[in-house]
Amino acid sequence: MMNLAQKIVASSFARLAFCACLVFGAFATEAMASDTLSIWVMDNGLGSKNAMKRLVKKFYRETGIPVKLTSLSWGEAFRKITFTFADSNDVAPDVIQLGSTWVPHFAAAGAIRPIDSLISKIDTSRFLGEGLRSTHISGKPETYAVPWFIDVRGFFVNERIWQQLGFDDSDFESYAHVLGVLKTIASSDLKTEAGVKVTPFALPGKDDWTGQQCMAPFVWSHGGDFVVPSGKGYRSALLDSNTLVGLALYAKIMGDAQMAPHSLFENSSENAEGFVRSERVIHYGTSELIKQLEFPEQAGGLANSAIAKDGIKVMDLPAGSHGKFSFMGGSHLALGNKKDTSKYALAEQLLAYMLRADNIDAFSRQVGFLPADRSILHIWNRDSRYSKIVAELEHSRSFPNIPEWGEVEKVLIDLSNNMGALFVNTKHQKKRSAALAQMVYEANSKINEILNHSDSLNGSEKMHWAQHIFLQDYNEIYPKSAAEIIGRSELPLVDEIKDKIGSCRYLLISVGAGFLALCIVLTCFRRKKKK
């Protein structure tokens, strides 16, 4: 047995050992925390969270460096990133996902740091040129981010209904053809299994956030743009003639009660839901829709949906007067510009790891967005579901890489939503056109103010010109099967369609000529009477 002295000594050593464990344990925990990296990513759809967890665990196995993963919603991301870097830089992320159009803004704000020293290690030659354009601020050489995945939009159709109506791929080759197809579908009496009338198409006209992306193909395909270089900066191009033609077509479809009857009451998510329920024949959306068909309903997927049964067909982009274009966005990865630079080297290691070809491929396959790495794209091209989406990259454009684009984008989003509100309350075509011209003129002025561009345009003349373009008819080419669906007596002839553009002018000339002829006859009759 231990005597009292021995017990006291033993007890003292035990306490000392326990304290030592606490102290060294605290140091160990602190050391571990100091090595932990932080990465912020958005919720990129079904499968994205699990895919990121796997990538982070794999990185830890390879390097021994722990990573704290934070997932943000797209709705909160911009604001949270802005405030975190401005107010509490210490807890800002080491690596961060940014929407492609956000990179110039956060680079100019000093929230992310240049990564030029990593270019050769990452090998940015692997990435698409259009994606690389938004990795820096326009006119400046520094690179601030690297493309991660691509968000390219395309036109999808319900394959079963498309075939049932007897349509062909050539019936979608131009926007004139698209109008003919939309009007043909509108004249059909198709209904879903639930008895809901099938409608042709929908654009987001209420409480939406993607208006600029949806307007883009209409504007670009007709030679227009939202902003263009001017001197040392940029100016709004909303009142340029080609832009107005594209906006007029967009507005024509959005405000048409037959071609897109639900546009004025839905956002882009609701547009997609209608397509998924097979209540719409055509949808303009992203490639992630294809991937969602693989996930069961329990996981939030679309494997049991109506569109999964009917099938999705990806169409070639329709052409306008200046070619065919679609919007290409996506997400980039960047490095946080932090006051504490002690983990910069580790953060660079994580960035390079995330951008490895195998990791880009693994993540992209889970979320359904195209990989930004060209060396992987050729593999995706073998999949018939994605081959046309990959082919669209040749005709895809991104928005300008200027710091002000975020503010410009808000004006364009408001413009699209305001169009929807206008069309709900105003049915008269001339009143619609006048109000729309005023709306575009005001948006043009706001954008020029954001870009610090002095506008010397004559407002009344420009609004009058815009209204004139908004009143013009757009050519329509009907599919061959339209005669059976609409009825031959109701189907416009090709010559009638061509003449429709100048019908009002022709009517005035005809009336004038008739009046002149009547005057001549009356004059001759009076002269004969005098004789």
Locate predicted features.
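Hinge/lid segment of periplasmic solute-binding proteins
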Residues: 99-154, 194-195, 211-214, 307-318
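Conserved C-terminal helix/tail region of periplasmic/extracytoplasmic solute-binding proteins
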Residues: 394-527
